[in-house]
């Protein structure tokens, strides 16, 4: 199933329940989990090398890259704009790294500030302002039940140079990590501040540079083995449903002006 798994949490829940009842494989297309930087950082998180992750940022910012094809600008068919399109990847990656899906509350705000402009400079060609029926940027603040917090930022069009997509920044008690300019790990060693940049592409030979396996290929191969051999899913349907629930809560909070509390 392509991301996001559904437009709202009720639909996502129904999908999870149906998969469980029928014994069918429900796999959600969060392929950014399979990138080499993501897999490396996940192993660090599993080994508790970052310690308790209590603050994180989920990044999905474009300066001017509004998708002008298909139904991306149609709220009824798409469900929303950049939040549900690319914000979903960043949030999924962040929650997965934290291994924390216990959400306490969500506060959010959406904006449609640049959609009516005709001087666009868009990477995918000019959009039609009259067809632009979704937000052009959205921001959320997510509080977890253990006290950890996540900031989510998503935009197709925003006057910023801090562009990042499907990236996460993590702050733990032992170390921190971000995906700016490659994967960077920061920590204190011998009373000094250290930044480590793992070589993830098989480097180390003067005449050869390793080639990274595309995340999409990894995802397809794993799906085959899940179906054919019973391999364990990396993207659990229940996890993807939580992502959908948080996105829906951000939209709801933006409309109501209130914080949305989870059960």
Protein language model annotation of sequence segments:
Residues 22-25, 52-54, 136, 146-148:
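Short, well-ordered coil/turn segments that N-cap beta-strands
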Residues 1-33, 48:
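Beta-strand-loop-alpha-helix segment that lines the small-molecule cofactor/substrate pocket
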Residues 32-132, 257:
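Predominantly a Rossmann-like dinucleotide-binding segment in NAD(P)-dependent oxidoreductases
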Residues 1-2, 26-28, 57, 152, ...:
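Hydrophobic residues in well-ordered beta-strands that form the structural core
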Residues 11-16, 21, 145, 195, ...:
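C-terminal helix-rich "cap/oligomerization" subdomain common to oxidoreductases
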Residues 92-186, 220-231:
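Contiguous beta-strand/loop segments that form the cofactor/metal-binding neighborhood of enzyme cores
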Residues 197-211:
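C-terminal "lid/loop" region of Rossmann-like NAD(P)-dependent oxidoreductases
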Residues 179, 208-220:
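Active-site loop of classical SDR/Rossmann-like NAD(P)-dependent oxidoreductases
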């Amino acid at each position: 199933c392509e991301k996001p798994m559904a437009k709202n949490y009720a639909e996502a829940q129904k999908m999870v329940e149906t998969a469980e009842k029928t014994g069918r494989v429900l796999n959600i297309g969060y392929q950014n989990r399979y990138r080499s930087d993501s897999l490396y950082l996940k192993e660090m998180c599993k080994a508790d090398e970052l310690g308790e992750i209590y603050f994180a940022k989920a990044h999905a910012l474009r300066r001017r890259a509004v998708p002008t094809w298909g139904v991306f600008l149609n709220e009824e068919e798409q469900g929303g704009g950049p939040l549900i399109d690319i914000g979903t990847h960043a949030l999924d990656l962040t929650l997965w790294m934290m291994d924390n899906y216990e959400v306490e509350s969500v506060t959010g705000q959406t904006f449609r500030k640049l959609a009516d402009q005709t001087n666009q400079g868009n990477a995918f060609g000019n959009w039609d302002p009259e067809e632009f029926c979704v937000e052009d940027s959205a921001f959320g603040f997510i509080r977890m039940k253990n006290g950890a917090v996540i900031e989510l930022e998503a935009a197709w069009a925003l006057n910023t140079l801090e562009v990042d997509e499907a990236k996460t920044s993590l702050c733990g008690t032992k170390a921190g990590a971000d995906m700016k300019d490659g994967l960077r790990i920061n920590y204190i060693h011998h009373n000094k501040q250290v930044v480590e940049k793992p070589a993830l592409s098989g480097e180390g030979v003067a005449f050869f540079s390793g080639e990274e396996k595309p995340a999409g290929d990894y995802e397809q191969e794993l799906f085959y083995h899940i179906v054919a051999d019973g391999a364990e899913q990396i993207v659990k349907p229940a996890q993807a449903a939580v992502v959908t629930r948080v996105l829906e809560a951000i939209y709801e909070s933006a409309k109501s002006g209130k914080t949305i509390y989870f059960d």
